[in-house]
Amino acid sequence: MIKKLSKLVKDFTLSELRTGMKITAKELVNKKITVQFPEERTPISPRFRGLHALRRYPNGEERCIACKLCEAVCPANAITIESEMRDDGTRRTIVYDIDLFKCIFCGFCEEACPVDAIVETQIFDYAFKSRQGSIMTKERLLEVGSQNEQAINQARLEDAKYK
């Protein structure tokens, strides 16, 4: 009986509504934390895992040796690699595709790579006009790597102290 009476008093005095209004009034005078995204950007961690890139050596040769460790370790089976032997006896990729719709951006491919060929950049704002655009081909991956080599190196330097 006392519980019912107590609930009736709370409902009648609108105590929950007053509590909510008090919180709202308090937050009205606090500093806003909203970021106006396209114009303003929040800092990104050096460990952020975004769009993939394939790297090259300083002499221009691609780093990937087609060991297929990244393909084997990928939990989402998002990576497809086909390779061939060169005349000098080394193996190189002819097809290196990553399906970004399948990829869960776990970073296992980057960790498994023995030559640091595949990396995840800090690029997070990208879009596709068609489903086919979600497949990153070897050429597109190398292009992303070439365009962002300095940013990739900087992020890896910042992250090195935590490894």
Swiss-Prot record:
Sequence positions that bind [4Fe-4S] cluster 1: C64, C67, C70, C113
InterPro entries registered for this protein in UniProt: 4Fe4S_Fe-S-bd (IPR017896), 4Fe4S_Fe_S_CS (IPR017900), NADH_quinone_OxRdtase_chainI (IPR010226)
Membrane association type: Peripheral membrane protein
Ranges for domain 4Fe-4S ferredoxin-type: 54-84, 94-123
Pfam families assigned to the protein according to its UniProt record, in alphabetical order: Fer4_7
Record key words, sorted: 4Fe-4S, Cell inner membrane, Cell membrane, Iron, Iron-sulfur, Membrane, Metal-binding, NAD, Quinone, Repeat, Translocase, Ubiquinone
Function field: NDH-1 shuttles electrons from NADH, via FMN and iron-sulfur (Fe-S) centers, to quinones in the respiratory chain. The immediate electron acceptor for the enzyme in this species is believed to be ubiquinone. Couples the redox reaction to proton translocation (for every two electrons transferred, four hydrogen ions are translocated across the cytoplasmic membrane), and thus conserves the redox energy in a proton gradient.
Homology family: Belongs to the complex I 23 kDa subunit family.
Name of the protein described by the UniProt record: NADH-quinone oxidoreductase subunit I
Organism: Ruthia magnifica subsp. Calyptogena magnifica
